[in-house]
Amino acid sequence: MAVQKYTMALFLAVALVAGPAAPTPPTPRTPPLLPPPRARDKATLTSRSVEDINAASRRPWWASVPPADKFKTFADHVLCVPNADVTSAATKAPQLKAKLDAAYRVAYEAAEGSTPEAKYDAFIAALTEALRVIAGAFEVHAVKPATEEVVADPVGELQIVDKIDAAFKIAATAANSAPANDKFTVFEGAFNKAIKESTAGAYETYKFIPSLEAAVKQAYGATVARAPEVKYAVFEAGLTKAITAMSEAQKVAKPPLSPQPPQVLPLAAGGAATVAAASDVRVCRSHGTLQDACLLRCRGGCQPVVWRGGSHRARGGYKV
């Protein structure tokens, strides 16, 4: 489950970053080239997704689909078809299916093409390449060196996201002060150096490192802007979204704690009610609502009243 979960998180990340790649026209009349059953059984979830993508663009009826309907047809025949692998994984990670669908659509929307068909071809090329990068990156027990193998928790998988995030921040900081024409060169050098340093002696044993570095370079080369500063800005924004998606995917969703009502104790000897104070509440003086919920209405100009003992509407709360 862990490998599937983080594989698909990275799948979404690379789909976000890959953007428009050099389109490789599919061959519609070529019969699907699927591996023999035994090899397919052993393939990872991501590898099978690669096969499904490629097979969909090679089916005989594909040539007769109007260009404007390419993506809708693809969505109907691939995205909406029940997939036992995805369904099984989604039962263990509820957000998986939504992230998978989002990855397809983000990659498609980011694709560039003068015609709907050309745009679809660019989408297929970008998404297939992204899936291939991931297929070689996160295979069972091939992600991290044996010294980092764990049984209960995918520590290595979590750590690498943090390392990528840290390396990105270091590289972006270094690139910001570089001349426009040198920004990506500076970024690439700093990024690779930071990754090597953060993984220390284990760098060579991380099989996905070369693919990661290649994906970074490909993402930069795929941007359509001509001006170096604009091209770098587009690349940096895409990679930032990717790392954010990876970081969010690795967080364990926890339901927010529901506020506890204040406890009103019996009257003390002096006649005053003793309140077991919860957290103080800041209320907008003008509108009587919680200050956090009133920031837009007051545009940050709230004059808060602090209520002790929980909610300002609860019995026992009082102003100060």
UniProtKB/Swiss-Prot annotation:
Question: Where are stretches of biased composition, namely Pro residues?
Answer: 22-37
Q: Does the keyword Signal apply?
A: yes
Keywords from UniProt, A to Z, are:
Allergen, Signal
Q: Which InterPro entries match?
A: Poa_pIX/Phl_pVI, Pollen_allergen/Os
> Where is the stretch described as Disordered?
21-45
Pfam annotation, one family: Pollen_allerg_2
Leader peptide range in chain numbering: 1-23
Disulfide links within the chain: none
Q: Which domain of life is it from?
A: Eukaryota
Keyword Cytoplasm listed? The answer is no
Family listed: Belongs to the Poa p IX/Phl p VI allergen family.
Protein name, UniProt field = Major pollen allergen Pha a 5.1
Q: Which organism is it from?
A: Phalaris aquatica
